[in-house]
């Protein structure tokens, strides 16, 4: 019994780093954006996808493969809320991990990506 408790405590100490990364559905993502209108909204798709498929109003485009080299474009406060999305929810997982590696601690990621957002008939913007 004592061994189990020791391993449980060790696991918690080793793997609980305090980072917050939450994968949410469309409605929860939308509610979080409404509740936190000043949060940083990050689109990690490509420029071509941004232009072709539209984007969420107010989003900043930084492709997931460029996050580390363009880190100066991210919020200076590592605890600031970041709303994060990609096309389908795959690249945003990689991007969330990169953001955590960069020290960010408060990330809400749209698990269905913009595809799920559009399928739910939510609004998107198109560049002119």
Regions found by a protein language model. Give the residues of each.
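Rhodanese-like catalytic fold shared by cysteine-dependent sulfurtransferases
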Residues: 1-32, 38-40, 47-81, 87-128
């Amino acid at each position: 019994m004592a061994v189990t408790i020791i391993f449980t405590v060790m696991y918690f100490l080793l793997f609980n780093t305090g980072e917050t990364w939450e994968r949410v559905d469309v409605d929860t993502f939308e509610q979080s954006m409404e509740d936190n209108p000043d949060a940083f909204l990050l689109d990690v798709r490509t420029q071509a996808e941004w232009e072709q498929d539209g984007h969420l109003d107010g989003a900043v485009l930084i492709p997931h493969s460029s996050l580390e080299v363009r880190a100066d474009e991210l919020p200076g406060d590592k605890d600031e809320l970041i709303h994060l999305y990609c096309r389908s929810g795959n690249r945003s997982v990689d991007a969330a991990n990169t953001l955590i590696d960069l020290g960010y601690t408060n990330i809400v990621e749209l698990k269905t990506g913009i595809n799920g957002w559009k399928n739910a008939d939510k609004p998107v913007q198109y560049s002119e």
